[in-house]
Amino acid sequence: MQNSTTEFLKPRQIDVNTFSATRAKVSMQPFERGFGHTLGNALRRILLSSMNGFAPTEVAIAGVLHEYSTVDGIQEDVVDILLNIKGIVFKLHGRSQVQLVLKKSGSGVVSAGDIELPHDVEILNPGHVICHLADNGQIEMEIKVEQGRGYQSVSGRQVVRDENRQIGAIQLDASFSPISRVSFEVEPARVEQRTDLDKLVLDIETDGSIDPEEAVRSAARILIDQMSIFADLQGTPVEEVEEKAPPIDPVLLRPVDDLELTVRSANCLKAEDIYYIGDLIQRTETELLKTPNLGRKSLNEIKEVLASKGLTLGSKLEAWPPVGLEKP
């Protein structure tokens, strides 16, 4: 029993009931009330979505250019063959990918056990049927197997373009998860006089490439690793960044007199408090035409001079006028 009412109970009893190499029930108790559902749901989601596994990602079949083909002498079409290949359970030791070869001819069943394997690759369901050959049938293919996590579609998976890749290689959607099924139940538990506690029971079934008990341990490590950051949570002070005004083109800081306009045009601009080229380019044609004594001819003169410098009327300038700019 805990020493204080403020301390949380931790599970002290863990039982593993193994039904087969691929299925087991793991029960843990006691948990404080509510923790059974909290942890059970988190572990279940991690087990289903975040466990590493192996899956075929690419298949190249001799004489086949696309998945909607058929092959003489083979009972199944290519789509069915690819679906059957996805059902093969691979396990790689010490490597993250491998290229496998399958060659067979003559009447009979082609199964996963017919694939040629290096010493560090296993097929856990060698009796899994890939296709059936007729008397004159033959099949030759290469299968690429990779390590990954969760489910990855071809469009969502970044496929490395290899110039040496065999023509006609077909990309496969890949389900890497080694977990076939997982569910959990929360049952009542009791410690001394307390009867409001939880018992968590996880029912896990895998494809055989990982032990159910090891799967729970891996999921727990992932959860701990993800949550550990919150244990050391510290606010990061936000530094106040002084906004710097964008640099101003030196041409804009020059007085309008430098444009060498006619005296009439220059005087009209100064009468409207337009002293710098930066002041001028922010005015529109309509605004300038409202200026007393400044007509269309003067406006065209101003536009031509500005255009020669790569400037136009109606421009917008940020932080204008700059600090410290005075009338000339």
UniProtKB/Swiss-Prot annotation:
<dbReference type="GO" id="GO:0005737">
    <property type="term" value="C:cytoplasm"/>
</dbReference>
<dbReference type="Pfam" id="PF01000">
    <property type="entry name" value="RNA_pol_A_bac"/>
</dbReference>
<keyword id="KW-0548">Nucleotidyltransferase</keyword>
<protein>
    <recommendedName>
        <fullName>DNA-directed RNA polymerase subunit alpha</fullName>
        <ecNumber>2.7.7.6</ecNumber>
    </recommendedName>
</protein>
<dbReference type="Pfam" id="PF03118">
    <property type="entry name" value="RNA_pol_A_CTD"/>
</dbReference>
<dbReference type="GO" id="GO:0003899">
    <property type="term" value="F:DNA-directed RNA polymerase activity"/>
</dbReference>
<feature type="region of interest" description="Alpha C-terminal domain (alpha-CTD)">
    <location>
        <begin position="248"/>
        <end position="328"/>
    </location>
</feature>
<dbReference type="InterPro" id="IPR011262">
    <property type="entry name" value="DNA-dir_RNA_pol_insert"/>
</dbReference>
<feature type="region of interest" description="Alpha N-terminal domain (alpha-NTD)">
    <location>
        <begin position="1"/>
        <end position="234"/>
    </location>
</feature>
<keyword id="KW-0808">Transferase</keyword>
<dbReference type="InterPro" id="IPR036643">
    <property type="entry name" value="RNApol_insert_sf"/>
</dbReference>
<dbReference type="GO" id="GO:0003677">
    <property type="term" value="F:DNA binding"/>
</dbReference>
<dbReference type="GO" id="GO:0000428">
    <property type="term" value="C:DNA-directed RNA polymerase complex"/>
</dbReference>
<dbReference type="GO" id="GO:0046983">
    <property type="term" value="F:protein dimerization activity"/>
</dbReference>
<comment type="similarity">
    <text>Belongs to the RNA polymerase alpha chain family.</text>
</comment>
<dbReference type="InterPro" id="IPR011260">
    <property type="entry name" value="RNAP_asu_C"/>
</dbReference>
<dbReference type="InterPro" id="IPR036603">
    <property type="entry name" value="RBP11-like"/>
</dbReference>
<comment type="subunit">
    <text>Homodimer. The RNAP catalytic core consists of 2 alpha, 1 beta, 1 beta' and 1 omega subunit. When a sigma factor is associated with the core the holoenzyme is formed, which can initiate transcription.</text>
</comment>
<dbReference type="Pfam" id="PF01193">
    <property type="entry name" value="RNA_pol_L"/>
</dbReference>
<dbReference type="GO" id="GO:0006351">
    <property type="term" value="P:DNA-templated transcription"/>
</dbReference>
<dbReference type="InterPro" id="IPR011773">
    <property type="entry name" value="DNA-dir_RpoA"/>
</dbReference>
<comment type="function">
    <text>DNA-dependent RNA polymerase catalyzes the transcription of DNA into RNA using the four ribonucleoside triphosphates as substrates.</text>
</comment>
<keyword id="KW-0804">Transcription</keyword>
<dbReference type="InterPro" id="IPR011263">
    <property type="entry name" value="DNA-dir_RNA_pol_RpoA/D/Rpb3"/>
</dbReference>
<keyword id="KW-0240">DNA-directed RNA polymerase</keyword>
